[in-house]
Amino acid sequence: MTTNTHTLQIEEILELLPHRFPFLLVDRVLDFEEGRFLRAVKNVSVNEPFFQGHFPGKPIFPGVLILEAMAQATGILAFKSVGKLEPGELYYFAGIDEARFKRPVVPGDQMIMEVTFEKTRRGLTRFKGVALVDGKVVCEATMMCARSREA
């Protein structure tokens, strides 16, 4: 456990990510170290709009949105590690490998996303990500993002 903890509240997250409700999936950053790792939280509420159809009577947080939450966490880590983008630049979600879903996420859960920087090569940055609920893995994946000018 580090003694020099860095946290980010929602106001700071909104300065870094372009996402907004209902697609902002990071509520708070619990800890990070630039260029190394980030731990963030998503509080899963029954009021999420997608629960109306996924699934009526048995609400389950969509797996693709777990991946998106981890991708947003990697975006925050990238911004905090290499700085804000220049005008006309974006971080694009460029790929995902080895995604595995271990158990469902349901309303009332607090999902912790842990992402770690792996490497940058040819303009692509690779991260490992894991999402946990109550200390148990619900999803894991390798994700890539690319910094690029808007098309």
Curated annotation (Swiss-Prot):
The record's Gene Ontology biological-process terms are: fatty acid biosynthetic process; lipid A biosynthetic process
EC main group:
lyase
Q: Which residues form a coiled coil?
A: none
> What PTMs does it carry?
The N-terminus is blocked.
**GO molecular function, a single term:** (3R)-hydroxyacyl-[acyl-carrier-protein] dehydratase activity
* Assembly: Oligomer.
Q: What does this protein do?
A: Involved in unsaturated fatty acids biosynthesis. Catalyzes the dehydration of short chain beta-hydroxyacyl-ACPs and long chain saturated and unsaturated beta-hydroxyacyl-ACPs.
Which named protein is this? 3-hydroxyacyl-[acyl-carrier-protein] dehydratase FabZ
